[in-house]
Amino acid sequence: MRRIRLLSELVAWFLLASQTFTSSSAARAQDQAQPAKRTETEGAGPDSAFGEVRRLSRQGKYDEALAQLQDLAAKQVVLKGLSHQFGVTYFKKADYRKAVESFKKALEEDPEDNEAIQLMGLSYYLAGKSAEAIGPLEKVQTWYATANLDAAYILGICYMQTKDYPSARKAFAKMFDVPADSAASYLFTARMLLRQDFAPIAEEYAKKAVELDPKLPRVHMLLGEIYLYKSRVPEAIEQFQKELELNPGEAAVYYKLADAYSRLQKYEEAERLLQRSIWLDATSTGPYILMGKVLEKKGETALAVRALQRAIAMDPNNPMPHHLLGQAYREIGRTEEAERELKLAEQLQIHQDAKP
């Protein structure tokens, strides 16, 4: 069980670092896994020998942990699990090339080391070698009665990056537990494609979803987002309006439609739609930020300030509302407050850009 907990921690760490999933989803996926074959003996021996290595790794002292492993390798001719532990430590250090080399060696020593297979797939992916990641990640999927969500997502991304879009669709269909040829499958894949900046293929898949089921919730919204992304604003508006006919209680559609109207400088229409979006969902910052921009364009700067202050109260680390608030303060002559907000916006943007 310690091995399973270790793999959960590593996958959670990877997901946090890549900002793809939450660590809790990784833990849930591990609950479905078949128990990985242990590569270490019970009690003393490897567990005891690797204890200090794991302690150093938990503290982020990866070079020291690797030095400990190298000492162990020099002192003992055979230490079961040593290659595996090298791979884990290199993985946590983000040295994915060396992690792959270590996991390959671990699998030569124990071909049924499931942890090594999964972490090798992740290492290939993080090293930018999507084609090589596919084989190990496909194998991971055979261990689960239902999809391992983390591995299925990454596998789908790898298929996309190698331009194998039908296989990506099947991976996402399994992930969401829908038929591979269904409208929902095309919708989910189109969403993932847009997120990864594959806009032309995303449009193709979204249109296919509409063809299969014109009344599928959110499909017209996604197509509208794709058109907005491509600056095809009239077409985006048409799709958002179709979505509202099917899904009039969806706050995000009003927000997206308001965004489209604001790009055409139709600020009155945009303001009305933003009010409806906020009435339906007062917890999202996007409509408040856009409301601030729209009100400022209308010359209602005092009201714009209130909307932007509300957005900042909800998300104080977002640089955009601080920047817009600084501009609004400058317009109404509150120079000192304007400079403070603009400086803070710049600092937050630098911090945001510095994140991996």
Which ranges hold each PLM region?
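Structural signature of tandem alpha-helical TPR/SEL1-like repeats
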Residues: 60-67, 93-105, 127-139, 162-174, ...
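TPR/TPR-like (Sel1-like) alpha-helical repeat modules
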Residues: 313-315, 319-353
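Structural marker of alpha-solenoid helical repeat scaffolds
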Residues: 75, 109, 143-144, 177-178, ...
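Helix-start (N-cap) detector for alpha-helical repeat units in TPR-like alpha-solenoids
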Residues: 46, 80-81, 114-115, 147-150, ...
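Alpha-helical segment of the N-proximal tetratricopeptide repeat
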Residues: 45-71, 75, 88, 92, ...
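Canonical tetratricopeptide repeat
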Residues: 85, 119, 153-154, 188, ...
